[in-house]
Amino acid sequence: MNTSRFILALLISLFITAPINAQSIREQDIRAELGFLASDAMQGRGSGTIYERIAAEYIGSQFQQFGLEPGGDTDSAGNKSFVQRVPVQTAPSGATWNTIGILRGSDPGEAIMLSAHLDHLGVNEAAPGDDKIFNGADDDASGSVAVIELARGLAAGKKPRRTIYFVCFGSEERGGLGSRQFIDNPPVPLTQIVADLQFEMLGRPDAKVAAGTLWLTGFERSSLGPELARHGAALVADPHPEQHFFQRSDNYPLALRGVIAHTVSSYGLHTDYHRASDDVSKIDFPFMTRSINSLVKPVQWLANSYFRPAWLPGQAPTPRPTR
């Protein structure tokens, strides 16, 4: 066993969390999962590093425990993995990694997607102060944990009508390399994905919205947000339109390809963004647990309904013209 494989196996064996109660989304599981992904041992999950791969494998191990179908690479023996290797020549390890789990629905022609990015900024020896590890607890270990826990909750229910893809992308911090690979080589035609909810920075409440509320980027662009809110989701419009968050996560390249794709967040512009101080100690776990739980029934409705969201007139994103 080479060093990289040994580190991967050791860390996952130390931190893997068993689904003690697979039907409920509990704070203790969220603490364990986020505590692993944002631990110093994970060295900031730098894009394209062995630690990003460990994060991908860990998330895949959770998906496996919930009974999801693997949607990643197939090895020479024909065995399917939850992890998808994406060659990247400029990455430290020569690749980045996505994790894909599938909850198969009864209608093979339609799917929804729940996604996040699993990487962060790694280690920066030039950073001021003693802490050089950018743990990325909020950005975006919190989003990855939301995907894990929604997989837990949804897999424990009845088989949905629409297939649900649970996807954690690698190298978002390096320009969305993982999501680009997914879009260019999707496991299902993009026309069959009726909606994607990307989860980004859900670890702390945003004081600009009501208590217990999450916000949706591009809320005014499509019929998805209002309809989810009508079915119980505590979702409101992004209170920071000047930040252009709709265009700043992995939802955007999907949206440019026609998928109704938005980001769910509660980021209140805290000062730990992209700093070594984005640590587990700053996470509001009761808020995060309530937030994830609040989305289970609305997502179940979306997975079982015949509602197909659409861009509102004049609101579909279009690529910027090249000069």
Predicted features by range, described:
Residues 25, 29-32, 36, 50-65, ...:
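Extracytoplasmic/secreted proteins, especially bacterial periplasmic and envelope-associated proteins
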Residues 109, 159, 169-263, 267-272, ...:
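Metal-dependent peptidase/peptidase-like ectodomains
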Residues 37, 63, 90-127:
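Acidic/His- and Gly-rich active-site-bordering loop/insert found
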Residues 101, 114-120, 124-175, 295:
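Alpha-helical metal-binding/catalytic segments enriched in His/Glu/Asp
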Residues 7-18:
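Bacterial N-terminal signal peptides
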Residues 45-103:
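A non-catalytic alpha/beta surface segment that caps or lines the substrate-entry region
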Residues 40-50, 87-89, 99, 128-140, ...:
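Second-shell loop/turn segments in exported
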Residues 271-323:
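His/Asp/Glu-rich mid-to-C-terminal helical/loop segments that flank catalytic regions of hydrolases
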